[in-house]
Amino acid sequence: MQTQDKVLILHGWGGSDAPHWQAELASEIAKNYGTVSFPLLDNCHFPSKNRWIKQVKQILEEFKPDTIVCHSLANTLWFWLCHEEGMQTIERLFMVSPPSLLTEEKTIKTFFPCALPQNIYAKEVQMFVSNTDPWVKMEEAKRVAKHYDIPLTIIQDAGHINADSGYGKWDLIEQLVLDKS
């Protein structure tokens, strides 16, 4: 990451406040003089796809990120945004724990089902899932990665890769986003 890069971190259902790895990542970017936006999306515990799309489109327009880091439902949100007109291509997209495109959960039902967009609007994409994620089966995660011809990292026994599964500070994502070797 160059100090002029702008990183947008998008949380999933319920937010990603500390000690979640996304909160830790936002802090690390700021400590390294990076430019980061880590907004709390509207009504995060009872999200609406249309409200989130509207909010994030405005953030994209105003902040103009180079890198976007999505966790969970934010990946589905990104897919919906990619169906919208006028999307600009970003440099890097990190997709962590995307849920099934056919998720059946009453509280987030406006997001599903979701079709894969033709264009993912990112020059470089990396996807991370866990073999024990309750929100997606490995076969589906592999199909999504293959569809976009993107690298898929499968982390063993990491649940939904969130604070509840032990992912507060996550060195790997920090190294990748900050381009540390």
How would you describe each model-predicted region?
Residues 2-64:
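Active-site catalytic motif of lipid deacylating hydrolases and related acyltransferases
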Residues 12, 40-44, 93-103:
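Active-site nucleophile loop of the alpha/beta-hydrolase fold
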Residues 15-16, 102, 131-136:
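Acidic catalytic loop of the alpha/beta-hydrolase fold
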Residues 26, 131-151:
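Conserved loop-alpha-helix segment in the C-terminal half of the alpha/beta-hydrolase fold
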Residues 34-37, 146-162:
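Catalytic histidine neighborhood in serine/cysteine hydrolases
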Residues 47-48, 158-169:
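Catalytic histidine-centered segment of alpha/beta-hydrolase-like enzymes
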Residues 68-79:
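Gly/Ala-rich beta-loop-alpha elbow adjacent to hydrolase catalytic centers
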Residues 121, 126-129, 133:
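Short beta-strand/loop motif that positions the catalytic acidic residue
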